[in-house]
């Protein structure tokens, strides 16, 4: 079957791409590589290749996956996507049960099966893994690209420590299926997947294919030390924080925001696009 690979040329794992593709060759044959070097390249390549290939291998992190998800046609009409995690966070890959390493993931993909996944409609953009606003986004904003590349997932811990000295709060109002959470908040997270910031399971019950989004609100009054302890010990947040679930959410806040780790104005509404694309996942 015709297959191509869109690959983030700036990935710290670039030299491992040939080894990963060699492991996929028995299933997909020869896989030509299309490097994506500049912002927007992966999205453009995905749109151009969508009608030419049956399988699109994506080598990169959540930002590359984000671009590909925005370049492909909706409704499962595009190619089957195979993820080779090669970024800092690799959170969508984690949500699928793939190891955050391109060669190890390629081994898993050899026997993986297609799975219909949801996307989140955030207005002009779609999110593959989720939306994080407030403290979670600020932790990423303090990181430079070289720091992320050098430290890998540990960069998010460094960012969290730097942003968390005196974290600001913002007024926020979130509504899902008639349920409303309103007040000063540290963060609002809207998840398709549950992992954020390189394997921190902020919404562990989220399912990327259930047709629902999951919302976590971190109120301003919660103990910062308690949050830090939970994230350091369990890589999760306390279970008693406000959580909502439904097919759509309305979010009113001025928090800084990121979609799949990429800067973006906080969307006023987020709606699930059920079964919007097909991705290989471990059986």
Short names for language-model regions:
Residues 132, 136, 189-204, 263:
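Glycine-rich phosphate/pyrophosphate-binding beta-alpha loops
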Residues 4-5, 12, 18, 34-36, ...:
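Catalytic core of DAGKc-family lipid kinases
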Residues 176, 180-182, 207, 217-283:
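ATP/nucleoside-binding phosphotransfer catalytic cores, i.e., glycine-rich phosphate-binding loops
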């Amino acid at each position: 079957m015709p297959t191509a690979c869109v690959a983030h040329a700036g990935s710290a794992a670039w030299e491992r791409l040939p080894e990963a593709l060699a492991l996929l060759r028995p299933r997909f044959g020869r896989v030509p590589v299309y490097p994506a070097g500049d912002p927007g390249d992966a999205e453009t390549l995905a749109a151009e290749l969508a009608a030419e290939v049956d399988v699109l291998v994506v080598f990169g992190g959540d930002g590359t996956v984000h671009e590909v998800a925005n370049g492909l046609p909706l409704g499962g009409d595009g190619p089957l996507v195979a993820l080779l995690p090669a970024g800092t966070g690799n959170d969508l890959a984690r949500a699928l049960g793939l190891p955050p390493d391109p060669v190890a993931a390629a081994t898993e993909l050899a026997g993986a099966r297609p799975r219909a996944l949801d996307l989140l409609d955030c207005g002009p953009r779609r999110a593959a893994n989720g939306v994080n606003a407030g403290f979670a986004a600020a932790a990423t904003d303090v990181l430079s690209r070289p720091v992320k590349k050098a430290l890998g997932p540990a960069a998010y811990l460094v960012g969290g420590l730097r942003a968390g000295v005196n974290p600001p709060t913002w007024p926020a109002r979130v509504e899902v299926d008639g349920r409303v959470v309103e007040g000063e908040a540290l963060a609002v997270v809207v998840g398709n997947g549950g992992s954020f910031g390189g394997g921190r399971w902020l919404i562990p019950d989220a399912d990327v294919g259930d047709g629902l989004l999951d919302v976590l609100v971190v109120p301003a009054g919660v103990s910062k030390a308690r949050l830090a302890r939970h994230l350091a010990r369990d890589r999760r947040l306390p279970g008693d924080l406000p959580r909502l679930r439904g097919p759509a959410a309305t979010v009113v806040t001025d928090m800084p925001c990121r979609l799949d780790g990429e800067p973006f104005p906080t969307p006023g509404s987020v709606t699930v696009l059920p079964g919007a694309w097909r991705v290989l996942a471990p059986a």
